Amino acid sequence: MRVLKLISQILVFIACVYLAKQLFTLDEIKLINTKNESNESFSHDLIIKENLLTGAFNKTKEEASHLSLITSQIIDAGSDILLSIGTSNKLDMNFTQSPYGFEIIDYLESLRTIRVRVDDPVSFAQFLADNGDGFEFEQNVRLKLPAVPEQRILEAEEPFSGLSMNWLGAKSDRRESGHGIKVAILDTGIDINHESLYGLDYSEVSLLDNGIDAGIGHGTGIASIIAGQTDEFLGLAPSSEVLSVKVLNSDGEGDSFTIAKGIVLAVDQGSDIINLSLGGFSSSAAMDQAIQYAKSKDVLLVSAVGNDGTEGVLYPARHKDVIAVSSVDAKSRVSSFASYGPEVDLAAPGVGIVTAWEDNHFVEFSGTSIATAFVTGALAHELSKSPSQNKNVIIEALYSNLDETEKPGKDIWAGRGVVNLRRLEQRNTPGIVDAAVVGYYFDSNNLSSSGTIPFQVTVQNQGTAWIQSMSLKVNYKGLEKNFRLGNMSAGESRSETLYFDSDSPDKTLSISSELSLLGQTDVLPKNNVRKSSLILP
């Protein structure tokens, strides 16, 4: 029976290898200011095609023989394998020499993980069978840049262009923001000679074998949002120290061992926050250990949920100790390309963001990768105000001052809500009155039905003062509905339900909503009104 169990584990592994070949797209890059005049497009999204095979080798000699045979059949010569050594294992490092069928490539001591290349699968399998107690092994999974996402997806989104910082409510006098905070960017590398990054407090470590600096646009764009230096492209935390850890080569390819090694290096070099604008479908034991190592040192990790546009938050964003970031457009609508699931924590701007790029270019950058950079920058900004503050307190402050999206409460699309730096900055300032219409929510299960269908209009008190009394007026389909909302506490949200006839031949639904406050003056009246036009299925 135990032999059959081992065989079943191997078969599961083979299935994982097959499924991991499915690719996803995270980011769309459109060149907007370059030396050539073409409207060239780039895709710089990352995939970790991860396959995990974990074994606890407490077995008889017969079972070991079966395992050796099966393992040799699924591991080819040249395979890149990670061996995790249990703390109880006292093996001498000489075991890595011949005749055991593999060559050591690298070793991450803090995680007790060895990266090896298998030369002789049969000898390697026998080594595992003979020395398996306290060992786990997995393939060192690769990263890949898939094709450019379909442009039709982005055409339905409202781009931010150069207005993302104002939209977030970032202060113009933030040049000292980020002082005393170190941010690590694990990516393709950064073009430190870009005009928007002149003066950046910067260091770089490459974990790659070659020193080629081509293909570093993705990391450069991330860095410009976090710590851009010029007035035109001022980042959210321009005085932060940036550590660029190059874990992806010029083709945007890397592996889980190198990323895990990069996380450990960033932690050991004193980073406060690690930006991981990358992801994959399955987990990696080596990266799990690296994430736990970062947590033990009180280092924050921020990662993109992915751009697959379907349910399933990517790894490492879905790890419970990583902040998972989705994307919204300029109308605060969750991007249709963003992956979703219960692990999503929050959302930030991610459509048509103007950022730096390599060779002194500027691009429009779309994807959850760039949304992740906004969250990293916001955290660096807040941490710099109180460097000794417990980081969990800062995270809670960020979460408590997010804007609602279409559906009230935590949801699988935007998590707890959308980043609002203005609210975060002013959270301790009393007396701010700010009511907002935040959106409309349609349950997708209802849209395919006939007859009368409900939808919700959601409003939120985004100030710090109680709203004493306000009314909501909604116009749609020739109807006007009025609601008396009464009082609302700071941060509170409330929804009203309305109905429309789905059998109408006119599939366009135009909605206009307006809030009116009684006896109070709203400091930001423009968000009291929301007009939307939707095409119903």
Annotate each language-model stretch with its function.
Residues 22-149, 271-272:
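Inhibitory N-terminal propeptides of secreted protease zymogens
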Residues 229, 247-321, 331-334, 340, ...:
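Substrate-binding/access-modulating region of protease and related hydrolase catalytic domains
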Residues 223-226, 247-248, 273, 336, ...:
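Hydrolase catalytic cores
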